[in-house]
From Swiss-Prot, chain A:
SUPFAM superfamilies: ARM repeat (SSF48371), Clathrin adaptor appendage domain (SSF49348), Subdomain of clathrin and coatomer appendage domain (SSF55711). Its main location: membrane. Residues 646-667 have a biased composition (Low complexity). Keywords: Cell membrane, Coated pit, Endocytosis, Lipid-binding, Membrane, Protein transport, Transport. This is AP-2 complex subunit alpha-2. Component of the adaptor protein complex 2 (AP-2). Adaptor protein complexes function in protein transport via transport vesicles in different membrane traffic pathways. Adaptor protein complexes are vesicle coat components and appear to be involved in cargo selection and vesicle formation. AP-2 is involved in clathrin-dependent endocytosis in which cargo proteins are incorporated into vesicles surrounded by clathrin (clathrin-coated vesicles, CCVs) which are destined for fusion with the early endosome. It is found in: Cell membrane; Membrane, Coated pit. SMART domains: Alpha_adaptinC2. InterPro entries: Adaptor_Complx_Large_Subunit, AP2_complex_asu, ARM-like, ARM-type_fold, Clathrin/coatomer_adapt-like_N, Clathrin_a-adaptin_app_sub_C, Clathrin_a/b/g-adaptin_app_Ig, Clathrin_app_Ig-like_sf. Residues 612-681 are annotated as: Disordered. The lineage of its organism: Eukaryota, Metazoa, Chordata, Craniata, Vertebrata.
Length: 939, 148
């Protein structure tokens, strides 16, 4: 490298910088700068024309002043003049000033564009590079209008130099990001894809970035990039560490390019079998390399290697189809959880969060629970602890909820203030979601209030009240527990609120005990009264009037309190009004009227949990969706056992903040009607309606996705660049309920958003679907939910189709996917002994009752995975029934409204031939046929 | 893609800023101030990544100078960390064991090197040779023209 001509090109600049550095105070600096600004201004305005060098120097000084944090409002014109200089350095400084200082809406753009046009046409690669850089830096619409047509030509022209190609690719990418509508797709797109084969790795690197972004929005057009990317990746990962020369970074071959290629592949579903095999090999090689001893001790080596590894794991998770790879990924991350590098621990926690949502790896993730809990206790960096909290939340299910909730609670005592509120919300959600025993739930929430009362938002304490009111089995316990908690000399105001409300409703349930007699309850609450804020006092006054109804014996005491000046003449209007009205009510109303007016609160109608909504708001919709998906209870999926009461999964409305419990000011409380059933106002799917607009053909890849849901109930059904559709479903006997989540991935609204369920004529009599329309507007980044109630009337073969139509940015979108409601969802597993099994097997020996299929294995033949799939399919897996231990047998009953059909199945793997034989026997031919079809596709 | 890159000193003086998405001056200043505070408050052994607003921040300290990049949710943290390192290597090679003063006095060169390496928030070329060759050529061009 030649000795750099640092600054000696511009002495004046160096002097000025030194001056600034020598300034003793901020004031001195500002003074010096103002002097310089005045000087430059006068030079620019002066009569004497400035030479190029001086212009360059002054423009550079302005840049420096700008970097110091001062506003620069002149000099732009001079910079633009520099652009047309034919001295390279002057041109360069001119471009630098513009790329740093010019905003995209500047009036100068037209002048700048002119200069750029000249440089692009100059065929001088250095000048072209400067011009392309400037376009990429400013990236305004006007620039896109001027150059978006031109740059693709530069990019794919045969005689363009490599360095210019690289710049052109990234420049086009920038324009596409800001103004996609102005970048015309055309012949060049296919030629751009072929840049993935280019000899120059720098060109491939730049092109891959461009292709990835283009492919996200136009997947069909760039489909061919998948196989090219896989073969490129394969060549990189199998190359020796020196093959790629300067593109090898600390013994890692082309890490940037590898990461980009893996990223590109994440725009697509798993490729066709041929390409897929090669990709799987690549991914395995990457995973294997992680186990090899490092080729260098430098952190750069391990960082680059692990960057590729993490991206490979992201791809594996994205595909979510290769159980072996998923489990290996999980094990690898498990190792990182204990790594001495904080960075790797952080990333492993983050990555595992997404792994926890995959059916195949959820269990594997759960085995790391102790390590994660330990991280929560010992990590010194709050951002790592935050990741640990997220992961615990993601891996939580019914089996480990008590442990995770307990650990989160104990962490909460010392947690950083910045993340307390979030932890409180998470604990509240988990406690509710996985509560088998609602006394545990009540205890947990009261603990939350005790430990972190200030961070317990209204949503959380409203929620505990809603749940207690809706579940009569826990009311007595709740009353007793709050009564005890209130004994503490200092308790959080939120506890007083919860305690006041619950005792007001259910204090009678513990009044039999002389230690908590009505009078004691009242005095206990009233002892807190004067320490509380106005809203809490208002709530307590309502509790008192409820006591008047529950316990006539304390009526005089309460009337005395209400009558006291501090109530009747309270300065606060709300308190005064309540005192006056309650006192009057207690005096004039007969016992019957009191009993009616002050009746126990009716159950709250079910709605989406307000706590979950709040967490979503805090974390942004997308992150929580994933977490939400992960929290489904796998133990239910796997055992297919009876499901616990669904009350815990969805939630309830919140009372208004001022909590006028009685509604005395307005109408008397509505009679406790049942929550509106979804059937009542549900929109029956009208298959005969011919007014429906044209339905799109099934989206590509929809078949694959459909097959993935046969053995599982939750996950992502469909995803393109605009929309993500997630599913959560539960089935019980012949009934089911499916939650469909539509996520808007863009930042723009979807309008006229209309999902429609379509059942064919054959399907319609056999499967009943009911749902309600969703809000026709879906905000950018938002998610809407639709519930489908499902009834299986009789056995069926076809699947319903979900058609979604909406407008996005002026264009009409129309998507159809098969909804994975399959016959096997209505399976109830049946356990039976070997003898019974074979007896029944023989009874079903009629040729029409048996269907058999012999087929080649499409996935690795892993016993554990196979077992999980059979259980996921819904039948019981019968151990020690088949004389050959390698075979699998299952039994279950398909429940339909009209009939129940017993099913027996037997799967015989042949490892050598990599084949399976699947035999289904049921009492109905069509059922055997359909189940055999569905299950065969899984192995 | 990378949203922006900042170089600032331990004392909280901004040395270089490069924005890859149009952002108003006011917003830039606010973000710089906020992020510098967050990063400077972190202790040495802490992890190099943090969540900040809706972005991921990757930073590393070299002597008195912090290099700090904001990337998007899907981007790879570790490769960004090495991107910073590669940039430092490029500066080092060009200036010959670079120090903060080199960047202060030759900030325009620091920009030129960064521009050869990154464009529009994505890596343009990861080869040290290619990037340095481009810069060398530009320097040569400067000298030739200076002589002419």
């Amino acid at each position: 490298m030649p000795a750099v001509s640092k600054g000696d090109g511009m002495r004046g600049l160096a002097v000025f910088i030194s001056d600034i550095r020598n300034c003793k105070s901020k004031e001195a600096e500002i003074k010096r700068i103002n002097k310089e600004l005045a000087n430059i201004r006068s030079k620019f305005k002066g009569d004497k024309a400035l030479d190029g060098y001086s212009k360059k120097k002054y423009v550079c000084k302005l840049l420096f002043i700008f970097l110091l944090g001062h506003d620069i409002d002149f000099g732009h014109m001079e910079a633009v003049n520099l652009l047309s200089s034919n001295r390279y350095t002057e041109k360069q400084i001119g471009y630098l000033f513009i790329s740093v200082l010019v905003n995209s809406n500047s009036e100068l753009i037209r002048l700048i564009n002119n200069a750029i046009k000249n440089d692009l046409a100059s065929r001088n690669p250095t000048f072209m590079g400067l011009a392309l850089h400037c376009i990429a830096s400013v990236g305004s619409r006007e620039m896109a209008e001027a150059f978006a047509g031109e740059i693709p030509k530069v990019l794919v022209a045969g005689d363009t130099m490599d360095s210019v190609k690289q710049s052109a690719a990234l420049c086009l990418l920038r324009l596409y990001r800001t103004s996609p509508d102005l970048v015309p797709m055309g012949d060049w797109t296919s030629r751009v894809v072929h840049l993935l084969n280019d000899q120059h790795l720098g060109v491939v690197t730049a092109a891959t970035s461009l292709i990835t972004t283009l492919a996200q929005k136009n997947p069909e057009e760039f489909k061919t990039s998948v196989s090219l990317a896989v073969s490129r990746l394969s060549r990189i990962v199998t190359s020796a560490s020196t093959d790629l020369q300067d593109y090898t970074y600390y013994f890692v071959p082309a890490p940037w390019l590898s990461v980009k290629l893996l990223r590109l592949l994440q725009c697509y579903p798993p490729p066709d079998p041929a390409v897929r095999g090669r990709l799987t090999e690549c991914l395995e090689t990457i995973l294997n390399k992680a186990q090899e001893p490092p080729k260098s001790k430098k952190v750069q080596h391990s960082n680059a290697k692990n960057a590729v590894l993490f991206e490979a794991i992201s791809l594996i998770i994205h595909h979510d189809s290769e159980p072996n790879l998923l489990v290996r990924a999980c094990n690898q991350l498990g190792q990182f959880l204990q790594h001495r590098e904080t960075n790797l621990r952080y990333l492993a926690l983050e990555s595992m969060c997404t792994l926890a949502s995959s059916e195949f790896s959820h269990e594997a993730v759960k085995t790391h629970i102790e390590t994660v809990i330990n991280a929560l206790k010992t990590e010194r960096d709050v951002s790592v602890r935050q990741r640990a909290v997220d992961l615990l939340y993601a891996m939580c299910d019914r089996s480990n909820a008590p442990q995770i909730v307990a650990e989160m609670l104990s962490y909460l005592e010392t947690a950083d203030y910045s993340i307390r509120e979030e932890i409180v919300l998470k604990v509240a959600i988990l406690a509710e979601k996985y509560a088998v025993d609602y006394t545990w739930y009540v205890d947990t929430i009261l603990n939350l209030i005790r430990i972190a009362g200030d961070y317990v938002s209204e949503e959380v304490w409203y929620r505990v009240i809603q749940i207690v009111i809706n579940r009569d089995d826990v009311q007595g316990y709740a009353a007793k527990t709050v009564f005890e908690a209130l004994q503490a000399p200092a308790c959080h105001e939120n506890l007083v609120k919860v305690g006041g409300y619950i005792l007001g409703e259910f204090g009678n349930l513990i009044a039999g005990d002389p230690r908590s007699s009505p009078l004691i309850q009242f005095h206990l609450l009233h002892s807190k009264f004067h320490l509380c804020s106005v809203p809490t006092r208002a709530l307590l006054l309502s509790t008192y009037i409820k006591f008047v109804n529950l316990f006539p014996e304390v009526k005089p005491t309460i009337q005395d309190v209400l009558r006291s000046d501090s109530q009747l003449r309270n300065a606060d209007v709300e308190l005064q009004q309540r005192a006056v009205e309650y006192l009057r009510l207690s005096t004039v109303a007969s016992t019957d009227i009191l009993a009616t007016v002050l009746e126990e609160m009716p159950p709250f109608p079910e709605r989406e949990s307000s706590i979950l909504a709040k967490l979503k708001k805090k974390k942004g919709p997308s992150t929580v969706t994933d977490l939400e998906d992960t929290k489904r209870d796998r133990s239910v999926d796997v055992n297919g056992g009876p499901e616990p009461a669904p009350a815990s999964t969805s939630a309830v409305s919140t009372p208004s903040p001022s909590a006028d419990l009685l509604g005395l000011g307005a109408a008397p409380p509505a009679p406790a009607g049942p929550p509106p059933s979804s059937g009542g106002s549900g929109l029956l799917v009208d298959v005969f309606s011919d007014s429906a607009s044209v339905v799109a053909p099934l989206a590509p890849g929809s078949e694959d996705n459909f097959a993935r849901f046969v053995c599982k109930n939750n996950g992502v059904l469909f995803e393109n660049q605009l929309l993500q559709i997630g599913l959560k479903s539960e089935f019980r006997q012949n009934l089911g309920r499916m939650f469909i989540f539509y996520g808007n991935k863009t930042s723009t609204q979807f309008l006229n958003f209309t999902p429609t369920l379509i059942c064919s004529d054959d399907l319609q009599p056999n499967l009943n679907l009911q749902t309600k329309p969703v809000d026709p507007t879906v905000e950018g980044g938002a998610q809407v939910q639709q519930v489908v109630n499902i009834e299986c009337v009789s056995d069926f073969t076809e699947a319903p189709v979900l058609n979604i139509q909406f407008r996005y940015g002026g264009t009409f979108q129309n998507v159809s996917v098969q909804l994975p409601i399959t016959l096997n969802k209505f399976f109830q597993p049946t356990e039976m002994a070997s003898q019974d099994f074979f007896q029944r097997w023989k009874q079903l020996s009629n040729p029409q009752q048996e269907v058999q299929n012999i087929f080649k294995a499409k996935h690795p033949m892993d016993t554990e995975v196979t077992k999980a799939k059979i259980i996921g399919f819904g039948s019981a897996l019968l151990e020690e029934v088949d004389p050959n231990p390698a075979n699998f047998v299952g039994a279950g009953i398909i429940h339909t409204k009209t009939t129940q059909i017993g099913c027996l199945l037997r799967l015989e793997p042949n490892l050598q031939a990599q084949m399976y034989r699947l035999t289904l026997r049921t009492s109905k031919e069509a059922v055997s046929q359909r189940l055999c079809e569905l299950l065969s596709a899984q192995f | 893609m990378m949203r922006f890159m900042l170089l600032f000193s331990r004392q909280g003086k901004l040395r270089l800023q490069k924005w890859y998405l149009a952002t108003s001056d006011k917003e830039r200043k606010k973000m710089v101030r906020e992020l510098m505070q967050v990063v400077l408050a972190r202790k040495p052994k802490m992890c190099s990544f943090l969540e900040w607003r809706d972005l991921k921040v990757v930073y590393k300290r070299y002597a008195s100078l912090y290099f700090c990049c904001a990337i998007e949710g899907q981007d790879n943290e570790l490769i960004t960390l090495e991107l910073i390192h590669r940039y430092v290597e490029l500066l080092d090679k060009y200036f010959g064991s670079v120090c903060e003063l080199d960047i202060i006095f030759n900030f325009e060169k620091a920009y030129f090197i960064l521009d050869e390496f990154l464009m529009g928030g994505d890596v343009q070329d990861t080869s040290k040779k290619s990037v340095l060759k481009a810069i060398e050529q530009a320097d040569l061009l400067q000298e030739e023209m200076g002589l002419a």
